[in-house]
Amino acid sequence: MTERRGVRGSDAVLLLAVLLTVPAAVGAQEAPALATDRVAVVPFDNISGSVDDGWLGAGIAETVTAGLSGSGVALRSVTRVLDAAAGEQLGARWVVSGSYQRLGDQLRVTARVRDESTGMVVGAVTVDGALAGFFALQDRVVAALVPVLAGLVPGGRGPDEVRAPAPEAPARAAREQRGPPARPRPATPPAAAPERAVRTAGVIDGPPPPVAPAVINRDAEGRATIRATRLTEVLTLDGQLDESVYATVPAISDFIQQMPDPGAPPTEKTDAWILFDEANLYVGARIWDSAPPSEWIANEMRRDSEQLFRNDNFWVIVDTFYDRRNAVAFFSNALGGMGDAAITNEGNPNRDWNPVWDVRTGRFEGGWTVEMEIPFRSLRYRPGPDQIWGIQLRRNLARKNEWVFVSPPPISVGGGGGIFRVSAAATLVGLEVPEGSKNLEIKPYGIGGLSTNLAATPPTRNVGDGNAGVDVKYGITQNLTADFTYNTDFAQVEVDEQQVNLTRFSLFFPEKREFFLEGAGIFDFARGAQLGSFYTALRRIGAGGGNPMGGGNAPTLFYSRQIGLQRGTVVPIVGGGRVTGKVGDFDVGFLNIHTGDEAAAGVAMTNFTVARVKRDILRRSSLGALFTNRSVSLLGDGASQAYGADATFAFFENVGVIGYLAKTDTPGRADKNLSYQGRFDYAADRYGVQAEHLVVEDHFIPEVGFLRRDNFRRTYTTGRFSPRPRSLDSIRQFRLEGSFDYIEAADTGSVETRQSQVGVSAELENSDRVGFNVVDNYEFLVRPFTPGPGVTLPVGGYRFQDVEATYSLGLQRRLTGTVTVRAGEYFNGTIRSVGFMRARLPITEQFSVEPSVSLNWIDTPLGAFRTDLVVARVNYTFTPRMFFSGLTQYNSANSTVSNNLRLRWEYSPGSELFVVYTEARETDPLMPDRSTELRNRGFVVKVNRLFRF
């Protein structure tokens, strides 16, 4: 059985509003005074209409009358009357009325408390139960009404002092497997009272809940609280929005611009609804657009693609723990493309997280519609049936470069990153989530294929192989999840996109394997919120963990690609487990994985352990600790460990402080094994400043992490001035930035890197961007460096400068991408570079081509060389759940041409079929006879099936 009750207390503000709105026509007869300690109870209405059930209404009213009289609330009289008018004649301020409905042997009773002085419903409760337990059900109605009246009557007990007994959950009918595109979903029996008040469990960071039928309430600061509506009918997920709920429940329509005109109304209307039933959260929206469909930016259906992020789209994020830091996001465009992301610490979105959910879209004369269905079992939340969540709704109108929110974040995080400012989200109340589900998921897989490896010893050709394994997910509690994997296989994962590396440091590649993606943000170390815009006029030189604005030099203490991969060779994962979630104010994560041996990579069987705990403090800050262990070190006999403690603080809208202290234990390296960092960020819209000090000692070696460079002490500062000129209609914002990076050896103190940058850029109103920067470098090579074939630079100091110009084509254009031209010095020589990166050309709504080209000509006194990187991706999306992707890459640095062809079909939510072909060829023979020599290739078919219990 479920139970819901709402409380709305009268206060001085409400009383004043009532007094001001009472009609006071001259000569009108004065209404009789209503006593605040008198209650009238009227018979409850029989919604079901069955004559046999007619006696129930009088029985409920009689029990309520008697129960309230002996409740202990300071009431002078509780009288049963025939109707509300009779109660008013008795001078009763409060009238209790209601209804009941019967479905089989189940009974639902809804009771409302109305203030006769205003006619407003100020509280409501709903109780479900079996007809056989009718007397106990009546007692629970009384127990639920007592705290409502206690909060209204002077001298009464507080509304939180009395709670009705928790009901039992009724048996739920088994859900059918997904069928055709339009799928009905079960809903609860029709509710009688659309104006049910909301009960909340917790403190709301915003205005009070809206009083039904209103669904949104704003305060003077613009903060919003939204009320979710329980469905009273079956909802068919078809994107048409033709159910009666969309006509009877008010829409959330007062969206607000964040960009380009902060605080202004949107230029196009958006209506949204937040609905739920016993199994799912539903988000529906009607997206009005005065332009014809041919002008909409809707040209991608592939799940989680970068282009989908740039289309006209509609987003919802839910902060299910209401911690104002972490959330999950779901979005779609007019074509029904699906996108989702897990947001950690107000930034760092993980768009490779793929929960089970569904979406359908439609079109109407004047716009498009979207319906999302998000199962509660795909979410993690605090225990208890009544919830307070954070919620944000956003619409992106790409052709106008316009972003509108239901609760807009500060403009300093304008553009796409604004959706990740979780603390700016509205509050969601009124949800009733299922209780008691163990939430067990079992996902077995089978795989088979052929492989050829001519680089192996001995070479192999067309070797057949097959395998099977299983992943299991178990909800320990509603907010703590255990994952187990056995015989894990990642053959379906797309290959990495190659990068040009003209530095002497390692490249960083993101994790793409599904098992390591869910809950990955919990293991992030010393990563603060995204305070400002993603965009910068400065060149992001290098890669790796840490803040990209700071150059990516901070170590990543846990880097999951160290598990199951070694020197480019796949190492088999025998099995393992992970526990992630939230316990009170603590984020917790524990990971243990066991890998097999791999002779080709020289790796023995190894066990990996990672433990993470993080404590939320203040409003948006945290303290944490991380531990990693590798049972077999790569650098000596024995195990290696890393320990770290970190703190992230966020103040006001745009101030952040981050710090950490970490230590590693590596065989044979007992000293000089510390790393620590302190960083300050101020990121307002018009100005920005960052200062950082980072130390990585010589023997600090996180063997389950990532380290771009070692043995250094770094001091880094940057400043930004970014005005928005009102006198230039074509310019949205200028950015003038400068930075200074000073790196010296941690042990000797000698200078190794000194870099100064100055950059200027402009964002145009049509979303194009143009930029120009100048870089002055000093590098001291402590060992010889070979940037290209036949060229080895000797030890010594080098000073060199270069300039770079960029132009990024905006989202409104058919062809998008960034053109880059660079010229200047390179160590003791010269460099000329040209590139066209992240380009995309849609041929149709389903077919697109994504080319990227990077060409570099380098000439030094020791010789000249050229590096070419050409990447071409072809995408064909059959439906939002089935797509083909072909990726071809030519990299002259390692003389290879590689191909990766993938077909992915999600034939049922969470269940997939993959067909993958990969190939790598030697390109040295390419020049004389236009042929290539095969290195390796593979063909696999993998199928998995998700079972949810």
Regions found by a protein language model. Name each.
Residues 175-178, 183-616, 622-624:
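Structural preference for beta-rich elements and adjacent junctions enriched in aromatics
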Residues 10-24:
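Bacterial N-terminal signal peptides
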Residues 572, 660-949:
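Exposed, low-structure sequence patches enriched in small/polar residues
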Residues 381-387, 432-440, 474, 479, ...:
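Short loop/turn motifs that connect adjacent beta-strands in outer-membrane beta-barrel proteins
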Residues 31-107, 115-132, 158-169:
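Short beta-strand->alpha-helix linker/helix-N-cap micro-motif
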Residues 597-678:
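Beta-propeller domains
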Residues 32-37, 44, 139-186:
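Mid-sequence helix-capping/hinge segment at a functional interface
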Residues 1-9:
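N-terminal secretory signal peptides that target proteins for export/translocation
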